[in-house]
């Protein structure tokens, strides 16, 4: 790394010469006065549109593997229940169970294509917001923008699935590696510690890809970790935790809206997720 690159990285982490408190105040003003929350609402809509085609794809794929698929499906739903609000995860669980029984190759292909297509519109919305944050106008042709959005969506899906696999089966993977290469118990203990930083690295990499390719920036340098990606991940984890705690003690959506309560809760969680992604982009800008 030459001195020029070192200066660029140092400048990035100096946050434009702003103190953290000043940066937080400026980011809040941008959120309050701008259209970030409106764009986050649009993202929640695209996330919801992409969710159920994605479930059709995943459950159809799992249905082709019978016993192993049943175990993996149960583990995925159990993990979703630990991250998403209870009512939202229950809605997803019910939908998955209804779809799984009729898994076919046609549903597999259709679900994958539909999930990628709808999710790519959400990626385009993220790009529009980041362009506004950086003060640039979209100049890429439509076909190129669609390809970038689809490619980003596919890459993020692969990263998220890999991270989930490590979360759900990290222990088994470590034991398998230790047994195959005769690495011993020390490796198992070390693996149990390092698998979580690896999962975090996958998530940060997903955010870094989004912030690098989604906006129309001509001469942007690549950074594995940025203040915005750290802010986005931390904020997403925080709002997910706070929302779960709130619903645990003050869940009135199901009482007020009946069966629609779970859908509303899922949309709110997607809304907060979209806002966290966009706030991270604002911090980088």
Language model segments and positions:
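Membrane-embedded alpha-helices and immediately adjacent juxtamembrane helical segments
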Residues: 1-285
């Amino acid at each position: 790394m030459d001195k020029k690159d070192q200066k660029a990285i140092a400048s990035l982490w100096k946050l434009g010469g702003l103190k953290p408190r000043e940066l937080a105040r400026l980011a809040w003003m941008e959120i309050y006065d701008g259209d970030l929350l409106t764009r986050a609402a649009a993202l929640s809509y695209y996330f919801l549109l992409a969710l159920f085609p994605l479930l059709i794809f995943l459950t159809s794929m799992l249905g082709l593997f019978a016993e192993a698929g049943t175990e993996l499906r149960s583990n995925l739903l159990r993990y979703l229940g630990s991250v998403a609000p209870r009512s939202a995860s229950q809605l997803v669980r019910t939908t998955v169970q209804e779809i799984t029984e009729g898994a076919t190759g046609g549903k597999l292909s259709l679900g994958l294509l539909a999930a990628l297509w709808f999710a790519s519109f959400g990626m385009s919305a993220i790009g529009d917001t980041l362009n506004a944050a950086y003060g640039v106008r979209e100049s890429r042709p439509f076909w190129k923008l669609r390809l970038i959005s689809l490619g980003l969506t596919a890459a993020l899906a692969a990263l998220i699935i890999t991270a989930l696999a490590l979360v759900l089966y990290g222990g088994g993977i470590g034991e398998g590696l230790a047994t195959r290469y005769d690495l011993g118990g020390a490796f198992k203990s070390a693996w149990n510690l390092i698998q979580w930083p690896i999962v975090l690295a996958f998530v940060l990499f997903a955010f870094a890809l989004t912030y690098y390719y989604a906006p129309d920036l001509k001469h942007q340098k690549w950074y594995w970790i940025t203040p915005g990606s750290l802010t986005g991940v931390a904020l997403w984890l925080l709002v997910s935790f706070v929302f779960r705690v709130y619903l645990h003690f003050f869940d009135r959506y199901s009482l007020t809206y009946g069966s629609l309560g779970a859908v509303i809760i899922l949309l709110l969680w997607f809304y907060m997720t979209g806002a966290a992604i966009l706030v991270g982009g604002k911090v980088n800008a």
